[in-house]
Structure formats: C-alpha cells, structure tokens
C-alpha cells in the first residue's frame, strides 16, 4: 500500500477548549465538510460523532480523545479530540504530546476561560503551534473583539485576527478574510452554499485597519516583510500568508478565525487555516530520544526511510477488538503482523492488526508511515507513554509527565462476585489513565481510588458499572494531604539487634532540610571514607522513600524534602541492606521532633460565574471556605470571581452554588499548588487520623 498523502500534506492537530466552547460541534462540522459524515450529530441531543462512550453522550462532554482521520484539499488531517473538562487534563497532555498543531476554540461570549488557560499553558509547554477559532458568533452576547482582547490580557498571546465577522448574535451573516481582502456570505442552513463577495461598504474601513494591524504584527517577526512595509511597498497576499505560516509554526504568533460551528459558518475557512498555517511533521524539529544502553541522545527525522519509532499515547479497551493502543509514528514505517520492541519496558510486541480510526467506525490498514496516527490491536505490555521502535535501532522517546491525583474515595464491591471483577476492572482502568490510581489501605484494608477531581472518579465508577459490570459503594471523598518539613536538622537512625543467631546492624546520620515546593524528594550521599559502605547507600535511600509514604504527623506522604546522608557506622558481619533500610526509616521518624513537620493541602484555582445580584453571597461563601478572592471582572451581564480555595472546602460546592444562585451560577476549578494547612485545622486532621 503506497503512501496516500505526502508528509508535507499531513496535519496532526488537536482541538482544545474550555468545556462548552463548542469543541465537539466544531470537530463534527470538520468531519461533515471533509466528507466523513453525512448527517450532523448535535452534542445537546447526545448524538455527536466524536463522543462515543456512553457517559460522554449522557453528559454532553468529551472524555476520551478519539483520533479521527479526515481529508481536505489534498491534505490528510488527523484530528485528536481532547476533553475540555478540568478533570481530564491528562487526556489533553497526552494528546498534545503527539500533535503538531492545534485549534483553540473560544466561546465568543466568554473569551478565554479557566480551562482555556490550563490547556494553553500545556500547549506552550509542548511548543504546539495554535490557531484560534472564536466560535458561537451567533450567540447572544457574542463579541469577537472582546474575545481577542482576552487572548492578550489573560494569556499574553500575540494573537491577531485574520478574519472579522459580519454582524454578531442573530445578525451574524458572513466573514471577512483580511488576508485575501474579500468576504464570504452564507446562503443556506448547512453552510455549503457560500458566496465570495466584495467587503461590504460599511465594513471597509474596519477591514483596512485590522489588515494593517495584522501586517504590522507579522512584520515584526519577519525582517524582509518589515523592510517592504516600512518602504510603503504593497505586500501581496502570498507574502502575508507565508509570513503568518512561518510565525505560527515558530509559536510566536496565533491567527484568530471566527464563525459558528453550530450554524455551519466559518468551518471550511478554518480548515483552510489548518492547511495554510499549521505545520506538517516536516515543519517542526525532529523528535529527540535516547539510546537505552548508552544514554546517548539521538534524533528521529520524520522520514519513511528512517528506523521505525512511535509513541503510544492512549490505551483503550474496546468491546469488539479488545485492547487498542493508539500511537503516533514519528519515523519509518510499520507493517501489520510485524514485531517491534517496546524500548520503555524492554518487551518485544507483535503488531496484530493496524486500524485507522474514524469517530465510530474503523478501517483496517496494512501499513503506517511516518507522521501517521493509528491504533494497534494485540499489544500486551504497552501502556501510555511507551516507545515502540525497530528492534535493531532502539530508542526511547521523551515520555510524558502526569500530575499526581488530588482526591481519593474509598470504594467497596457490593457482593463477593463484584470483588473479583473489581480488581481486574481497576487494573484495566489504571492502564488506560495514568492519573487514576488504586491501592489498598494497609490499615483498613479498604480499596482507595484517587484521581483529578470528583467528576473524574464519578466517571471511573460509572465505567466500572457499565463496561465491567461491577457494582460498588463509594465513600465520602478524601483530600490528598501531604506532609513536609519546615526546619533543617541532623538526625540519627540506629537499628541494632543482637540476640542469638545473626545480628542486624545499621546506623546512619542524615541531615534533613526543606526543599522548594513542588521539587519533590532529593537524596544526597555525602559519606567520606566509607563509614557507610557504598553498597548500603541505595538501601538508605530506599528506606527513606518507603518511610516517606507514611508521614510522621498523620500518615500522609512526605514531599519536598532534602536528605543528606553524611555519617554512620557499620558492622562487618551484622550489617545488611535491610538493617540500613530500617535505620533510615527510624531516622525519618526521629525527624518528627526536630524538623517541625507540617501538613500541606491542595489549593484549587476556582472561577465562579454568576449574575451580579448574587455577588455578595458568593464572595461571603468563598471566604467562609477559607478562600482568597484573587480578582473579579464583569463578563457581559455576569460577574466572574476568581479565587484560590482549599480542595477540602470545595466538596459539594456544585450543589451549594446551585441553591445560592437558583441554578444560574457555574464554576470551574483546577488544581494549582500545595500550601500549609492552618494549625487549628491541621490539629483536627492529625487527631482524626490517629483515631483520638
């Protein structure tokens, strides 16, 4: 099977947005206009083409990034649909990792919202070029220029319109193209009948003004264009397009488009934007990796003749074919039925079948090429973030970093039959989602599941019921507290047992000190002259790491500390790894009295949108939840309150906000950072955990 589309004509893009900005509808329309769907499904009716898990259809939100392939003007566009709800940021992270470009969808009434900030930040981390689509121009309160202003004010993005809307709200009837300097008028409901027209008289001055602003902004990033502009020469549309493309691909500039996906306006022009301005796999730097045995850094060029290298970015259990592993090919080609090496796990895998995914049907293909995104059936050991590569040319591509869970609940099966199935279900769900964890509490014997938020865990429990037929009772949510040290101290840990038979002897002196918040645990070996032999040093580190899982105050994990092993002693016969492990854990326990341990709690960044009349009540409520109001602003006829609130105080907030605002308020929250728990509250938590 020969390559159908050249690498230059391939686009791997994601569509990212805040919940409800209309992302799924935009994706649907893209699939409709590229001829992949014959009838359009609406998200509010629960029939959307991309949202194919049952819960997604019920809740009208996108949970799993389905990868779909579409074609437009001789180009292949692979689309990864990403969720907009904060509890699913891991899905966004993992899809951004394998994208070359993205469309950020904004709601024309709200502009940039909290989750937009989160996904924008993630995309910046991965260096993903973006174009912006201001959607819902037909909605009451739609304001294109306000939305562009929020890109500058909240994201500090160098974003400029390449289009202007003709009219807004129910008067929205067309789009002005500032590059071509023409306009498009829509004649029918499905948006297929478009007429290219002159720019209407009353919009001409505005179009000239914004075209000049666009040229100025792009010329600042392009010397040749700047010279022409300063000398007053005419800049052709081809030159302008090329300069916008270059600046967009280097992530210095973000073109802004407008439209209404729901009303079928602006989607084809947005597709032109994807082809014109977003990069192909050859436009971006080749991916870097390391050779497993030598740790040498190598690059893998986007080239069919290079050795095969791919990254698995999603694992799913499919009711018909079993385990599906979605992967992005960075270099080389792969035939179905062949063997590859999972270099991350050092396991050989056989690629059974290769499927190209459409939103809800799949096409079996015999070969994939550099730049392709596909799904493999039959991989046994591969999980999210693993590298698959040619057996003779091993490489490990940079893997993904996932945030730690912030919320836990206890879960117990309703019957004995459920018990056995629950273990399997939890294992499969953990394979699919690295931010979901399940473990057994050693003291109570309960199964504890942890995730990124209440909705995340709701959906996990829901999936256990639907997909794995496991009925379970769920306890009240628990906050993932942490512990850390405030002071430095030198502490001794000694473990000596000499009573009959072989003795045990381990003795260490460790200096503990606070580390920067978020830096984690750092261990330093400062032993001089072999007072603790080299072979026992790893045991000291392992002993500390194990003991840190159960902190000294209330049994929560200890984070953000440094430990320097600087002295100790050993016994020729009685010393062992185990003895030094125990000595290190005793040192950590002894640090409790000297290092001033404190509890830390997750602080959430909360944004509440409410009608003005409820402002006083909501501000009071936030303060009563130990929240700090960070700022407020008017958005249309609503007020937006931004605050930092401890997660412990946010349980059940959705219900309380509904009753305080008669259902007219909405809120979003994202984990922001950990900070110290006030002493009076910490004392209560410690008491409760010690069962006093």
Swiss-Prot record:
GO terms for biological process: ribosome disassembly. HAMAP family: EF_G_EF_2_B. It is found in: Cytoplasm. PROSITE patterns: G_TR_1, G_TR_2. Residues 8-282 form the tr-type G domain. Belongs to the TRAFAC class translation factor GTPase superfamily. Classic translation factor GTPase family. EF-G/EF-2 subfamily. GTP binds at residues 17-24, 81-85, 135-138. GO terms for molecular function: GTP binding; GTPase activity; translation elongation factor activity. It comes from Geobacillus sp. (strain WCH70). Transmembrane segments: none annotated. Catalyzes the GTP-dependent ribosomal translocation step during translation elongation. During this step, the ribosome changes from the pre-translocational (PRE) to the post-translocational (POST) state as the newly formed A-site-bound peptidyl-tRNA and P-site-bound deacylated tRNA move to the P and E sites, respectively. Catalyzes the coordinated movement of the two tRNA molecules, the mRNA and conformational changes in the ribosome. It holds the Pfam family EFG_C. Keywords: Cytoplasm, Elongation factor, GTP-binding, Nucleotide-binding, Protein biosynthesis. This is Elongation factor G. SMART domains: EFG_C (SM00838), EFG_IV (SM00889). GO terms for cellular component: cytoplasm. Signal peptide: none annotated. InterPro entries: EFG_II (IPR041095), EFG_III (IPR009022), EFG_III/V (IPR035647), EFG_IV (IPR047872), EFG_V (IPR035649), EFG_V-like (IPR000640), EFTu-like_2 (IPR004161), G_TR_CS (IPR031157). SUPFAM superfamilies: EF-G C-terminal domain-like, P-loop containing nucleoside triphosphate hydrolases, Ribosomal protein S5 domain 2-like, Translation proteins.
């Amino acid at each position: 099977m020969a390559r159908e589309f050249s690498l230059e004509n391939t686009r791997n893009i994601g569509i990212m947005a805040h919940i409800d900005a209309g992302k799924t509808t935009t994706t649907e329309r893209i699939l409709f206009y590229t001829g992949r769907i014959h009838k359009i499904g609406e998200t509010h009716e629960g029939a959307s083409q991309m949202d194919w898990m049952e819960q997604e259809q019920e809740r009208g939100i996108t949970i799993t990034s389905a990868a779909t392939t579409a074609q437009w003007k001789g180009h292949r566009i692979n689309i990864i649909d990403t969720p907009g709800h904060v509890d699913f940021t891991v899905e966004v992270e993992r899809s951004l990792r394998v994208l070359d470009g993205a469309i950020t969808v904004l709601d024309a009434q709200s502009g940039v919202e909290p989750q937009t900030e989160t996904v924008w930040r993630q995309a910046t981390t991965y260096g993903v070029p973006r174009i912006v689509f201001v959607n819902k121009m037909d909605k009451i309160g739609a304001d294109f220029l306000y939305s562009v202003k929020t890109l500058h004010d909240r994201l500090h993005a160098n974003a400029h319109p390449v289009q202007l809307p003709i009219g807004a709200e129910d008067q929205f009837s067309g789009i002005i193209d500032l590059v071509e300097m023409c306009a498009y008028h829509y004649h029918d409901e499905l948006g297929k009948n478009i007429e290219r027209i002159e720019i209407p008289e009353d919009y001409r001055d505005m179009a000239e003004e914004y075209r000049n602003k666009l040229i100025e902004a792009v010329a600042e990033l392009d010397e040749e264009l700047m010279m022409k502009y300063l000398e007053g020469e005419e800049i052709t549309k081809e030159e302008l397009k090329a300069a916008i493309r270059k600046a967009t691909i280097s992530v210095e500039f973000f073109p802004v488009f407008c439209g209404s996906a729901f009303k079928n306006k602006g989607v084809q022009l947005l597709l032109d934007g994807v082809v014109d301005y977003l990069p192909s796999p050859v436009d971006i730097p080749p991916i870097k990796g390391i050779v497993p045995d030598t740790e040498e850094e190598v690059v893998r060029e986007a080239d069919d003749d290079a050795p095969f290298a791919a990254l698995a970015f999603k694992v799913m259990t499919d009711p018909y074919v079993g385990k599906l592993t979605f992967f992005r090919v960075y270099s080389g080609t792969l035939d179905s039925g062949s063997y590859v090496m999972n270099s991350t796990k050092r396991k050989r895998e056989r690629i059974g079948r290769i499927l190209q995914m459409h939103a809800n049907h799949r096409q079996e293909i015999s070969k994939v090429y550099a730049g392709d995104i596909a799904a493999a059936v039959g991989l046994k050991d591969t999980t999210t973030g693993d590298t698959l590569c040619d057996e003779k040319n091993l490489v490990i591509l940079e893997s993904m970093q996932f945030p730690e869970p912030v919320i836990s609940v206890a879960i117990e099966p309703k019957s004995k039959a459920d018990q056995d199935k629950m273990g399997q279900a939890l294992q499969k769900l953990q394979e699919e989602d690295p931010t979901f964890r399940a473990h057994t509490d050693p003291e109570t014997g309960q199964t504890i599941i942890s995730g990124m938020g209440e909705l995340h865990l709701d959906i996990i429990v829901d999936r256990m019921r639907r997909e794995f037929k496991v009925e379970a009772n769920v306890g009240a949510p628990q906050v993932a507290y942490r512990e850390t040290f405030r002071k430095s101290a030198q502490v001794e840990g000694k473990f000596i047992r000499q009573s009959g038979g072989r003795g045990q002897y381990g003795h260490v002196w460790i200096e503990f000190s606070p580390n920067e918040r978020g830096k984690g645990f750092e261990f330093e070996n400062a032993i001089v002259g072999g007072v603790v032999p080299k072979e026992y040093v790893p045991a000291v580190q392992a002993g500390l790491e194990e003991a840190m899982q159960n902190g000294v105050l209330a049994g929560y994990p200890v984070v953000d500390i440094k430990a320097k092993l600087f002295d100790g002693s050993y016994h020729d016969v009685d010393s062992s790894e185990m003895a030094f492990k125990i000595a290190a854990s005793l040192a950590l326990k002894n640090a409790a009295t000297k290092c001033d341990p404190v509890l830390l709690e997750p602080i959430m960044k909360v944004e509440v949108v409410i009608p003005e009349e409820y402002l006083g009540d909501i501000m009071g409520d936030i303060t009563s939840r130990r929240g700090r109001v960070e700022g407020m602003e008017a958005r249309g006829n609503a007020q937006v309150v931004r605050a930092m609130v401890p997660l412990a105080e946010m349980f059940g907030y959705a219900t309380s906000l509904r009753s305080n605002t008669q259902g007219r308020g909405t809120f979003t929250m994202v984990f922001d950072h950990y900070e110290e728990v006030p002493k009076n509250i910490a004392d209560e938590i410690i008491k409760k955990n010690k069962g006093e």
